[in-house]
Amino acid sequence: MESGNERISSQSQGTIHLSKEPTFLIQQATLPSDLHSTLLQETQCGGLTKNIKANTQKRRPGTVILSKRSSRIMSETQPRPPVIPSRRPGFRICYICGREFGSQSLAIHEPQCLEKWRTENSKLPKHLRRPEPSKPQPIGGTDSHSLQAANEEAFQSAQAQLLPCENCGRTFLPDRLLVHQRSCKPKGENPGPPSMGSSNVPTGLKKASSGIPARPRTLICYICGREFGTLSLPIHEPKCLEKWKIENDQLPRELRRPQPQKPQPLPAGQSSQEGASQAALVPCPNCGRTFAVDRLPVHQRSCKSQPSGPKTSNSNIERKGGPNPPTNSKQQRNMEAPNGDKVTGVI
């Protein structure tokens, strides 16, 4: 009996112990189930992600197949890119230079561009000058078609200002054509007939057939033969003539020259200015070479003359290797001494 009571008491104590900590036991009892549920959720999520990855991997080749469709199908399904217009909408073209400007900027630009065009056109040779471009008449309406028509007319007006190169045929603006022709050489010997008659132009005014001035236009002074600009020559000639008179008066009478006359342009195309400058040259009385009046005295200092007059024959003999007078005093004494003295001297 006692042993049975002890067993009952031990069982009751165990139940009391269990009743004292019900939460701990409940947690111990519930932990395995929670872990199981969480593990199930994780495995389910992992399976879903694997399925999603597998599905995406399976779907990717489909996109590649879609990109390899024919161009016809692609053009039907995909949207077409927008068409960019050739010119910016709302901009107007200058009828002089062909550049684009806004509607408000064009009204400010056109007077300045026309003034610049007139200045550059006046600097060109006469055969390259162009008539002043006329502004096209405005077309009624404000739609895009009327603006495009006005721009097309202005563009054609600007293109009409271009000039073709005589050598290569390319077109340029008149002021740029001169720059181009400096490096564009003609292919043949005679690229084309010159527009300006070179026969009526003196050597100082001769230019290339293309009208490119390699240097500023010059004229030759009929007194001294030097070249001067077209504006500088009228200032130089009176001073040069006054200087010539002073220098001519200082010369001896036999060397004085008549006053040079200003030549008139010759119709045959001869260089009258060069002839006048050559006529103003004075020949040297010793050697016959011609010099300017002020340079002749400088030349005569080295080209000495004898008092009897010009001795051209002796000078010619000397040039040909004729007998020259002995310059050494010892040689001169030997030549003056008799032959017998020379023999006795040698013996």
From Swiss-Prot:
* Cross-referenced Pfam families: zf-C2HC_2 (PF13913)
Q: Which domain of life is it from?
A: Eukaryota
Which positions bind Zn(2+) 2? C165, C168, H180, C184
Zinc-finger ranges (C2HC/C3H-type): 90-119, 161-190, 217-246, 280-309
State the protein's name. Answer: Zinc finger protein 474
Q: Where does Zn(2+) 4 bind?
A: C284, C287, H299, C303
Polar residues: compositionally biased ranges: 303-316
Q: Which cofactor names does the annotation list?
A: Zn(2+)
The record's annotation in InterPro entries points to: ZC2HC1A/B-like, Znf_C2HC_C3H
The record's section on PANTHER family has: C2H2 ZINC FINGER CGI-62-RELATED (PTHR13555), ZINC FINGER PROTEIN 474 (PTHR13555:SF68)
PROSITE patterns tied to this protein: ZF_C2HC_C3H
Region annotation Disordered: where it falls in the sequence:
124-145, 183-210, 255-277, 298-347
Q: Where does Zn(2+) 1 bind?
A: C94, C97, H109, C113
Record's keyword terms, sorted = Metal-binding, Repeat, Zinc, Zinc-finger
Q: The organism's lineage?
A: Eukaryota, Metazoa, Chordata, Craniata, Vertebrata
Q: A GO molecular function for this record? A: zinc ion binding
Q: Which residues bind Zn(2+) 3?
A: C221, C224, H236, C240
